[in-house]
Amino acid sequence: NVIFSPRANLRFNPTQNINLRLSYSSGFRAPQAFDEDMHIENVGGTVAMIERAKNLKEEKSQSFSASADIYHRFGAFQTNFLIEGFYTKLTDVFVLGEPYNRGDGVLVKLRSNGPGAKVVGVTLEGKLAYLSLLQVQAGLTLQRSRYDEPHKWHDDVPAKRTIFRTPNVYGYFTATYIPIKPLSIALSGTYTCLLYTSDAA
């Protein structure tokens, strides 16, 4: 099938040091079993086959974002701050059903289309550079991911709107110090909050 996925961007610079941007994009994921599904099952010590439902359709997305990118210099220091808000609407979301034994000892999970979903959040990023000696960069994303209708991923837990294995908070940090060339000292790290498994939505 031919799928039309338009994209559009609009940028406005009210001053030389401020960039404002509006973006729209659409996309899709083809109906298939993904490597990450098998990886998740193997981590749990169990291998389950992923089968596609006969009427499985592609998962589609429409995304909107607005951002402000600000630059400023304080003497020998250069700074940059970015704030971006985003909203994504998903339709025909891929979901995996409860595993069942197909009769030959092999566990099978059925991939089907679930309810729609929404992801909304904000990203903050900052950069600081001092001459050519030091550069520091950090970012933080706060988001909320929810199904439009409660979804039950296991018979032992109640149906909930929370999308499983999606973080609400994640971020990163990098720093590079160059005291003398060619010596470079770097430090970096990432943060991801605990992923939802069984708490209330």
Regions found by a protein language model. Give the residues of each.
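Flexible, solvent-exposed coil segments and beta strand-coil junctions
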Residues: N1, M38-I50, E98-L107, P150-D156, ...
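Signature of Gram-negative outer-membrane beta-barrel scaffolds
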Residues: N1-T15, A30, E41, H151-P158
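Outer-membrane beta-barrel strand-turn architecture
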Residues: F4, F12-Q16, K60, I70-G75, ...
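Hydrophobic, lipid-facing positions within transmembrane beta-strands of outer-membrane proteins
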Residues: F4-L10, L20, R52, Q62-A66, ...
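Membrane-spanning beta-strand positions in outer-membrane beta-barrel proteins
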Residues: N9, N13, N19-S23, Q78-N80, ...
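Membrane-embedded beta-barrel scaffold of Gram-negative outer-membrane proteins
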Residues: N13, R21, N55-S112, K118
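Gram-negative outer-membrane beta-barrel transporters
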Residues: N80-L90, F94, V106-L195
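Conserved small/polar residues in nucleotide/adenosyl-binding loops
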Residues: Y196-A201
